[in-house]
């Protein structure tokens, strides 16, 4: 049995990576999502039960509106396209933070949590609009 039960990642630096390698912050965020998928696969292979992704902090509201909208749309598209696959792989989605997003994104987040609530292979703790100062 793997002694590691929980992995946590602060998703920071994707925009800077994107500027350096792709000349686009948005492409960096998109590549970061591919990395998340690789990490999820790794966690399942190694039987790590919990993966926390600190994805959007309360401080991230200071980013330009266009970038924030891109991040939220990226998450919406991911949930629409991948939720069934995540559910079939027995991955549970748990959201932490205040859901102060668009009605569409809030609905998708709620739906993802409800749809995957009984899954036990891997729990993804998604920290969105979350800040340690508020805790």
State each model region's role:
Residues 1-135:
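Flexible, compositionally biased loop and terminal segments
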